[in-house]
Amino acid sequence: MSAAPTSGPLTCRRAGPLRGAIEVPGDKSISHRSLLFGALSTGETRVAGLLDAEDVHSTRRAVEALGATVRTEGAEVVVTPPATLREPGDVIDCGNSGTSLRLLTGVLSGVPGLSVLTGDASLRRRPVRRVIDPLRVMGANLSARDGDRLPPVVVRGGALRGARHLLPVASAQVKSALLLAGLFAEGETTVVEPEKSRDHTERMLRGMGVPVKVSGLEVSVSAARPAGGRVDVPGDISSAAFFLCGAAALPGSEVTVRNLGVNETRTGLLDVLRAMGADVRLANLREVAGEPRADVTVRADRLEGTEIRGATIPRLIDELPVVMVMATQARGRTVIRDAKELRVKESDRLAAMGETLSRAGARIELFEDGCAIDGPTPLRGVEVRTRLDHRIAMSMAVAQLFCGGEPVVLDDVACVATSFPSFFRLLDQVSGQASGGGAP
């Protein structure tokens, strides 16, 4: 069996069960922030476990354009900040990374000069108004395409003033963009969320010496520069989800993911797995550099449908596509609500997964903010349009495990490199394949 291609179509033809112990690459959210916060700091930042994937490369190129130096020393990446961030000499291309674009919009709002942020075709279809509008309240001078709705974003950096922001939807990216702008603003900046989103920004800034006030759903900062320091990036639970969900639903499976980040704002998946009846165990639980981590084992069991809504949604928003796959194998109905955010990711993930799983034989009803899935349902092989969305591609590679040996054909797997270049190799490893999972 040949190695999986890095671009173009791929035929997935694997069989379970999934068994073994693996480590997934470093957390993407923490990796982005490590580079960006390092560039804002007064001293050097050393990062262990940085994710080596295209999205993070976009952030690296961006901070280098702003004057930071980023170099590799052995297993660490070292960020040396400039005395002050400089105006970039060219357009900053964020590739497929919405995190890069939104967080940089916040930072550059307070950096004197002109900056232009753009990205690939997928990123240029993702909304930016919900970042632009609250930043304008702080005095930011911003404009964007299509009536300020879509990238590219033009930033004319200048003086900012603190403000109190009430977010209509919990979003770690919007929250982080506003807090980062607050580091350049006069007065206090406060962000209030309807539910708690991932809190890596708060933890990391505090770990770098920035006074961060957290009270319930409120987070506040004032003007400050981080001091830099050391960041140890745990494994990404959003990447581990493909293996954990596959193992939970595929009879005879047991998978352990070592050194996995288990920050409580990210562990909605573990709660859902338990609610559905999976055997979930955590071992070697510890905290390193302010982030909890553990070795997480999931063993297959008979799954039952459940309801996923409300405050759980921000804690597993990126994992929902593969949760939808898992739900097709659970007895009864699984209902997902309050997940409208899925419609403005790299693709409309609700529509994409709903249409693709339906063609594969799933019984699924779509709502504006979620779906209902009835199971268990044997799936069949299907051709998949990945829509340049890494999570659609990887979720449907997992779905193929439930297709009774029939292949799933992904039209283009280049998108997987944005977050998880080693995905197919690790899936081969736990499924007992030689390599690649491609057509024989």
Curated annotation (Swiss-Prot):
Residues reported in the UniProt entry to bind 3-phosphoshikimate: 28-29, 33, 171, 173, 318, 345
Gene3D superfamilies in the cross-refs: Enolpyruvate transferase domain (3.65.10.10)
Keyword Ribosomal protein: no
Annotated active site: 318 (proton acceptor)
Pfam family, one: EPSP_synthase
Residues reported to bind phosphoenolpyruvate: 28, 98, 126, 173, 349, 391
Keywords: Amino-acid biosynthesis, Aromatic amino acid biosynthesis, Cytoplasm, Transferase
This protein's record includes keyword Phosphoprotein: no
Oligomer and partners: Monomer.
Name used for this protein in its record: 3-phosphoshikimate 1-carboxyvinyltransferase
Gene name for this UniProt entry: aroA
